Amino acid sequence: MKKVVTLLVVFITLQTLVSGQIMKKTQPSNQTTKSTVSTNDLVSTREMDRINWMEFREVVPSKIQTVLLPTGTLEPHGVINNGADNTAPTAMAQQIARRTNAMIAPTLPYGITGSMADYPGAFQITEAAYRPFVKQILEGLAKNGFRNIIILNGHGGGQTAVLQSVAAEVSAEKKVRTLVINWWSLASDETKEVFGEDGGHAGNNETGYIQAIDPSLVHPERYKDDMATAYPAAGTWSAVPFPSSIGLYQKGQGYPKFDQKKADEYFKKVNDKVANLIIDVVRKWDLAGL
């Protein structure tokens, strides 16, 4: 009987160890959690849709005056998820919220997609519908006591200009301070530093950032170099829909690498760059008395 019990204990112990190893192997290195909870933080969570209204009132604006609003869209991204433009800024906000002492507004997942709107699974919101909706969101954030409204934009094209325009309007009308960040442009130097070349839409930079968040969203087995096309120089040619779901900033550069180590390094460098910009801009706003 003792032998049976001993064998059973050994079996259970081994199974537990094996299960733990499997969990470690399958857990993405930078997988974001559903809630940014910290026992040592000012609040139970940094996410506005997860916090209770009474706790929100206790910290905004007395202790927290900054809010991060991730914006994106649904469109093709080579061999990564259609929602990469939402996945990236959402994860970014979760990574930097505490460092920048900010709350996180719910992600705005639909946007002005543009030339890739005809691909399967893509959505296109007109500027006429998008502009007033975004403006009311920013006005709502101002009404709730946020002084610094930071838009972490995950999608370029015409959406960037609209966000910048609306943010400027709300800043003037509501006497708040706004900042619009296109992370892939801001982190251009980091892209070249980590990957040794320029990036692209769904290129080495964006694919790497998503791979660092969740490798299961990346499908290298589906990848072919022929899936990529370099963006044309101004005035040369224009195609709608754009003929490839991977758009390279420079010809011959930016193809996805699928290198986990570089992806993790890039993820950290980009987050640091964005966080440092926000901290610096807010500090200088304060110094100027704006």
Task: Kindly label every feature range from the protein language model.
Residues T6-T16:
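Bacterial N-terminal signal peptides
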Residues I22-A102, P106-G114, P120-A128, P132-I150, ...:
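Extended, histidine- and acidic-residue-enriched regions that form the cofactor-binding/catalytic faces
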Residues M1-V4:
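Positively charged n-region of N-terminal signal peptides that target proteins for export
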Residues V18-G20:
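Boundary at the C-terminal end of the N-terminal hydrophobic targeting segment
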